[in-house]
Amino acid sequence: MITRNRTSVLVLLLLSLLLQSCWNPFRPRMIDNSNDLIHNRTPLELLQNLERAYRERNINIYKSLLAPDFRFELISSEVNLIGIDVNEDGIRDSWWGFDEDVEFTDNLFNHGSTDGVYPSPDQITLRLMVPPEENWETDPELGHEDWIVIACNFDLTLTYLSSNSSLAAGGVARFYLRPSGNRWYIAIWRDESNL
């Protein structure tokens, strides 16, 4: 009887140790907030969500920020370097659309460079220096009367922990933001930086 009680106690003790070993108090369960609703109720909130999409490397958040007819535009000095032939006429274009931008950004977030030179970074930091609201502009183009144009200095840092290295870029991005319903979207992202 004593042996049976000892065996039962020993089995219960081992079972409780086994169950306890599955929980690590120094590594609590991660909470995924990426499914939180993205409201973009103001231009500032939209740009904060853009920083969040980069920080979390979340392509779904990123896509929710772009207008369906979104365009990424390059300055003319960059066209020969990074422009792509969007309309298949054999000439590099100074812009690309929603689908191409989502593909490029998904590669950045999750797969690395398309040429295989760079893996996906371990951390991405996009810091936008949003000017005060009184420095925002309205778009003078006909039909864009309710659009807001915000020129932001930015810093983008890609960090690679395994090689203890990082790539950094900075410059000016001009965002053309368009309201639709009670939300704001990026209609045009014009990169005004020199590479």
How would you label these PLM feature ranges?
Residues 1-22:
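Sec-dependent bacterial lipoprotein signal peptides
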Residues 58-76:
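Short, well-ordered alpha-helical segments enriched in acidic and aromatic residues
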Residues 23-35, 136-195:
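Short beta-strand edge/turn micro-motifs at domain boundaries
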Residues 86-164:
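Surface-exposed, charged secondary-structure patches
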Residues 73-75, 127-131, 178, 189:
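A structural detector for beta-sheet-dominated domains
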Residues 46, 50, 58, 62, ...:
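Stable alpha-helical elements in mature extracytoplasmic
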Residues 72-94:
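A short gly/proline-enriched turn/hairpin at secondary-structure junctions
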Residues 22-56, 64:
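Short, low-complexity N-terminal intrinsically disordered segments enriched in polar/charged residues
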